[in-house]
Amino acid sequence: RIVYLNGKFVPEDEATVPIKDQGFKYGDGVFDTTRTFGHKIFRLKEHLERFERTLKYMDLDPGHSMEDFQTITEEVVNRNLPLLDEKEDYWVTQRVTRGLSNDDKTAWPDWPDATVIVECSPLPLAARAKFYRDGIQLITPSVRRVAPEMVSPRAKTHNYINFVMGDLEVAAQNPEALSFLLDTQGNLSEGKGSNIFIVKDNKLATPKEQYVLPGVSRQVTIQLCERLGLEVEEKNLDLFDAYNADEIFITSTSFCICPVQSINGRLPFVSSCPGPVTESLIKAYVELVDFDWYTQYLDRL
């Protein structure tokens, strides 16, 4: 595949970054990810707006405008579409690191002040298809989400160590499960790239935005709830709420909306998967994007 690296479109296996890049050394970088539906990029503007907010939070100047990133992203996708099966779609990622420190630039004197990458990869449709048939098993590990008074969860940065540690802990318990982190107060926060919704008595609730990354798919889902006349509230939620839920689902760029089978082995009260509210939102999401991504996943079973 072709990637964009610092002003050039190059083959993926030729895109190299200095070993002393601060994104590699310190996790000093930011990124955002969108996806295609039927080979068309979805909500790129919203993703780039979030990307820009994270760059400002990190005081990181990419040397590119968001209009530049839009053009580059579209070009990367278009150059790689011939490599993609007509039934597949891409994840598309924009990534910026702080590049090299002044001390390290002696070995790479021409390296720009920021490292800028835009690349794409096929979505793991086959690996995730079972989640749409059976639902996802979630486990909350002992690792907690970094508190907002330390680092804002609203910034999408390279620092995913708490998610990685959570994934390792959960994988040791159940390789089929995904981790979902609690915050330092014991409230539900987020998974590695996913937000959570709880359904109780046909009313929905999701953790407050100030404690989680404000997912674009999360916002799309809230808008779909309003369109369908479903009440949705942003509030603190803990495991008591999850264990008493009728339905649970997660949202993310790649998953869109995916039902949860269990959390810490506890099953929601509605035994069908997906439950009726989740199913109605999946249908509305499919209609919104004008592409049946739900069947796209199920066809890989």
Residue ranges and their predicted role:
Residues 217-218:
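Secondary-structure junction motif
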Residues 1-180, 184-187, 213, 223-301:
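Conserved alpha/beta cores of soluble small-molecule-handling proteins
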Residues 179-180, 187-209, 214:
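Glycine- and Gly-Pro-enriched alpha-helical subdomains that act as flexible
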